[in-house]
UniProtKB/Swiss-Prot annotation:
Heterohexadecamer of 8 large chains and 8 small chains. This is Ribulose bisphosphate carboxylase large chain. The record marks K327 as: Transition state stabilizer. Keywords: Calvin cycle, Carbon dioxide fixation, Lyase, Magnesium, Metal-binding, Monooxygenase, Oxidoreductase, Photosynthesis. SUPFAM superfamilies: RuBisCo, C-terminal domain (SSF51649), RuBisCO, large subunit, small (N-terminal) domain (SSF54966). The keyword Metal-binding applies. Substrate binds at N116, T166, K170, R288, H320, S372. One of its GO terms (biological process) is reductive pentose-phosphate cycle. It comes from the Bacteria. NCBIfam families: PRK04208.1. The active site is at K168, H287. Mg(2+) binds at K194, D196, E197. It holds the Pfam family RuBisCO_large_N.
């Protein structure tokens, strides 16, 4: 029996939108999709259909086509490549002209690129793997409110990763107990503590009470340690008016940094908050809650490298980027690629890290990648090696789970971090010599010694689901 061809709703896009001879322009927005076509649909037709449905086309010819220059405005599928290890999927490279999009609007770009086309019958699965944003578009977007250099100057902390902790349990603590947990962590040696992504303003922990107790903890810890401290106060809320109210209150009481869940709050709302942070001198920590809904399926959705680029355009000073070694999803080479996309000014295409296009960020400042999720002191050598200085290493259970309490857990992490940074600066190989480095440091730190004993058997053995395609290893 012949394979079914999906004719309904599909016109001959190949003759119009497939242009293998097209020479891409510096001003084009470029995208690469992983496409699994329906049976009976050729690669060229499927690629052209994606280009058409994500730009100018509808399912049939309409008379108003004659009132514009469709050849100027259309997206063009200009190349096709095999996906290593797959007999069904292929990469489709598509170029979009600059006038197809509103300047500075990530929302507008992705309404086209990942809009109706993802439900199109000609394709069985579709994944946006990478996007090249030309400099003209980058320069019209807000970017990071402040960036890494400004934050280091504000904190007066240089030469090492910043150290943080997510307060646990993530839900259920009353405001006074929550503030006490923050204080213990900060006085123990952490730079920051953090609200978890789903801490907003629940009945047991109203946002105003949380902010006040956390700010009291910050001020007390700063007075005792002589260091600048902070707590990422999550201002995410159900309306933009509530978000601004919470942000204004955080500014009023003197906190240096607030937090947003950029995917669940919405891209327009997050961009507005980012602009507010720049105007008001507030740092912005960004959580990626909901990302795995879009990026974990290797055949359908949006790769996290695209979501990371979106955030860099919209604005944030920190973004969670995976850990490689913790409990959450994160292929090593792919994660290093994401880290580079967040921090560096210019990134060369590098298929070994999953990066399909050169990306020039111009003068936009880089932001701190955040490692968080199931990490503890035994992971410190690998984290310092993978992430380098310009990063935030965030230990939740790996701080608060210390048998001697939060302050001891924070102290253990700080001692481990400084030992690893010193060893690295001496030229030692952290991932090969990590155990020896930590063991020596623990000789003068009972807190670290107890942390190492507590978590020596803890491992997360599950493999990564979303891996880089095998050919590029």
């Amino acid at each position: 029996m012949a394979a079914k061809t999906y004719d309904a709703g599909v016109k001959d896009y190949r003759s119009i939108y497939w242009e293998p001879q097209y020479q891409v322009k510096d001003s084009d927005i470029l995208a690469v999709f992983k496409v699994v076509p329906q049976p009976g649909v050729s690669r060229e037709e499927a690629a052209a259909a994606v280009a058409a449905e994500s730009s100018t086309a509808t399912w049939t010819t309409v008379w108003t086509d004659l009132l514009t220059d469709l050849d100027y405005y259309k997206g063009r599928a200009y190349a096709i490549e095999d996906v290593p290890g797959s007999d069904e999927a292929f990469y489709a490279f598509i170029a979009y002209p600059m006038d197809l999009f509103e300047e500075g609007s990530v929302v507008n770009v992705f309404t086209s690129l990942v809009g109706n086309v993802f439900g199109f019958k000609a394709v069985r699965a579709l994944r946006l793997e990478d996007v090249r944003f030309p400099l003209w578009f980058v320069m019209t977007c807000p970017g990071a409110p402040h960036g890494m250099k400004v934050e280091r100057d504000l904190l007066d902390k240089y030469g090492r990763p910043l150290l943080g902790c997510t307060i646990k349990p993530k839900l259920g603590l009353a405001a006074k107990n929550y503030g006490r947990a923050v204080y213990e962590c900060l006085r123990g040696g952490l730079d920051f503590t953090k609200d978890d992504e789903n801490v907003n303003s629940q009945p047991f922990l109203r946002w105003r009470d949380r902010f006040l107790f956390c700010q009291e903890a910050i001020q007390k810890a700063e007075a005792e340690t002589g260091e600048r401290k902070g707590h990422y106060m999550n201002v995410t809320a159900g309306t933009m008016e509530e978000i601004y109210e919470r942000a204004e209150f955080a500014k009023e009481i003197g906190t240096p940094i607030i937090m947003s869940d950029y995917l669940t709050v919405g891209w327009a709302a997050h961009t507005s908050l980012s602009r507010w942070c720049r105007k008001n001198g507030m740092l912005l920590h960004v959580h990626r809650a909901m990302h795995a809904v879009m990026d974990r399926n290797p055949n359908h959705g949006i790769n996290f490298r695209v979501l990371a680029k979106i955030l860099r355009l919209m604005g944030g000073d920190h973004l969670h980027s995976g850990t490689v070694v913790g409990k959450l999803e994160g292929d090593r080479e792919a994660t290093i690629g994401w880290i580079n996309l967040l921090r560096d000014r210019f990134i060369k295409a590098d298929r070994s890290r999953g990066i399909f296009f050169d990306q020039d960020w111009g003068p936009q400042p880089g932001l701190f990648p955040v490692a968080s999720g199931g990490i503890h002191v035994w992971h410190m050598p690998a984290l310092v090696s993978i992430f380098g200085n310009d990063s935030v290493l965030q230990f939740g259970g790996g701080t608060l789970g210390h048998p001697w309490g939060n302050a001891a857990g924070a102290c253990a992490n700080r001692v481990a971090l400084e030992a690893c940074v010193q060893a690295r600066n001496e030229g030692r190989h952290l991932e090969k010599e990590g155990k020896e480095i930590l063991t020596k440091a623990a000789q003068s730190s009972p807190e670290l010694r107890m942390a190492m004993e507590t978590w020596k058997e803890i491992k997360f053995e599950f493999d990564t689901v979303d891996k880089l395609d095998v050919q590029h290893r």
